[in-house]
Amino acid sequence: MAKDKDITETLLTAAEERSDLPFLSVDDIPPITTVGGFVREFNVETKKLWYLAGPAIFTSVNQYSLGAITQVFAGHISTIALAAVSVENSVVAGFSFGIMLGMGSALETLCGQAFGAGKLSMLGVYLQRSWVILNVTALILSLLYIFAAPILASIGQTAAISSAAGIFSIYMIPQIFAYAINFPTAKFLQSQSKIMVMAVISAVALVIHVPLTWFVIVKLQWGMPGLAVVLNASWCFIDMAQLVYIFSGTCGEAWSGFSWEAFHNLWSFVRLSLASAVMLCLEVWYFMAIILFAGYLKNAEISVAALSICMNILGWTAMIAIGMNTAVSVRVSNELGANHPRTAKFSLLVAVITSTLIGFIVSMILLIFRDQYPSLFVKDEKVIILVKELTPILALSIVINNVQPVLSGVAVGAGWQAVVAYVNIACYYVFGIPFGLLLGYKLNYGVMGIWCGMLTGTVVQTIVLTWMICKTNWDTEASMAEDRIREWGGEVSEIKQLIN
């Protein structure tokens, strides 16, 4: 009787720990057998998703705008400054951003599932482990910033751009360490559905960034060093504000102070972080490669200019997909951690339907205004014509790229990073790129052929992920989430100890 009482008390304690979790289901949803039941649960889950996705989208847009605004002001310094900042932002910082964000994404799995299971005390330990690993990674990646000039020259950039971008890269070294703090901290807060505070902090950072950049560049005329100072300061402000929020006690048991446990089981944590990084980088670099391949075509200037406009639009629409990716990753990891497999599966379904509808709406708007919008970006008639020709495939890309990140978010939430990394290699690099190069160069379809071929790789990857999810036993995933929480927390389940 005493043992049964202890078991009951342990279960009640875990339930109480989760009782205040925003929008976390108390119980798993029942099997849905009617249309009315589907509509009711769909409405409930939609509110939960947008509670997370709305602020996440807002945060992504604000942080994306920091770099975009810096590039705008660079154009007021000189043409070479604009080129240098653009190259540093897309090549040097872009490479590092993919690795750091990917490694930080390991926390989406671990913190999300631990939070759903009520193991709140482990979240702070996971956060500190990720800080340790990402700061070591930042130290290694800083070599890329230091030697950016010769590296850029070796891949075909002009001497002037390579030199200017190399100097600017050295100025931007603090940013990589800001990433090392920001990305784990963001995942830590996201897993607890504390998205609104991130949105507010990013908005304040953007509001400060714009006038401060103007003052430093226009009034003080600090040039490129001034751009670096302000951009670094903006990212440091975001980090400091998030840390103050966490250290002030607003996260409860999730943050109980610094612990030596952060240095335990680091190698296993590194493996999951690397798997997350590989999975994300393979996707980011895949789309960066389209611009690179277009640069070797005949009339490369026109092809690259037109493709850059399309990629710019695709990048802005991707902010919606990134927000939905964050939301579904949190929802799936939380519900699996709480042992709610049906709710996790239904959350995925709602996210896919919602993202697909958004993608169709945006695509239809582009197709309707295909004759008008290109002139907003460029005056060259040849570029405008090519952008119009590329608009149908841009519209299709928006739909696919709205769905694909949701599926990737499920993979992160469920802890499938390593498997998806192999899928990405096969679909993107073994199939997509060779097919795109075949269409673009061999069959002379140009930039349209390259894009179509590589988009086919994305379609294949989406189909494979969909098949994986359809074949998934969600009860097994919920059980694996419990095992993962115990393994990575270095602890044994209290309930199993009591039962044994």
Curated annotation (Swiss-Prot):
It is found in: Vacuole membrane. InterPro entries: MATE_euk, MATE_fam. Its main location: membrane. The keyword Transport applies. Keywords: Membrane, Transmembrane, Transmembrane helix, Transport, Vacuole. It is a multi-pass membrane protein. The chain crosses the membrane at residues 67-87, 91-111, 132-152, 161-181, 197-217, 227-247, 277-297, 302-322, 349-369, 393-413, 419-439, 449-469. One of its GO terms (cellular component) is vacuole. One of its GO terms (biological process) is xenobiotic detoxification by transmembrane export across the plasma membrane. One of its GO terms (molecular function) is xenobiotic transmembrane transporter activity. The keyword Phosphoprotein does not apply. Pfam families: MatE (PF01554). PANTHER family: MULTIDRUG RESISTANCE PROTEIN. Belongs to the multi antimicrobial extrusion (MATE) (TC 2.A.66.1) family. This is Protein DETOXIFICATION 29. It comes from Arabidopsis thaliana. The lineage of its organism: Eukaryota, Viridiplantae, Streptophyta, Embryophyta, Tracheophyta.
